Amino acid sequence: MRYLLIDLSYYVFYRYFAIVNYIKLSTKTTPNLENVLENKEFMTKFDEMFEKSLLKIVKQNYGIKNLALSSDLQIIFAKDCSRANIWRQDHFQGYKACRDHVKKKDHFDGLIFEHVYSRVLPQLMKKYYSIHEFYVDRAEADDCIAVLIDCI
């Protein structure tokens, strides 16, 4: 059995800003990111590319052309716990405290995560039985992946 472990937050951030750049280049305008969930053009492209990019990764790195028919690859999206619950907060005061400033500067709408958690990921898990999510209450996705590597 082969495994593909993906840090879901990283994947979401990457897709989000890739779509922002795509829209900037294709329309020569900056997309309205005030309430990204209401931006139909952005959300349609985000949903489309979330799956399409995953399938491209699977094809290029694992040689799988039809994920729905594959039985030898398991894809695990590791989810971050909420920032307030990260175990490192107990040891490092202000851990990731500067992230809010960066989000405001970059116009990142964190509601995209709720969209991915409640809509995009469940649809993919229903469509492709080889896709799963993994979550630990006080751990970030990269911590989860580090532990999973030792277990599989």
What are these regions (language model features)?
Residues R2-I152:
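Noncatalytic, basic helical substrate-engagement surface that gates or grips nucleic-acid strands
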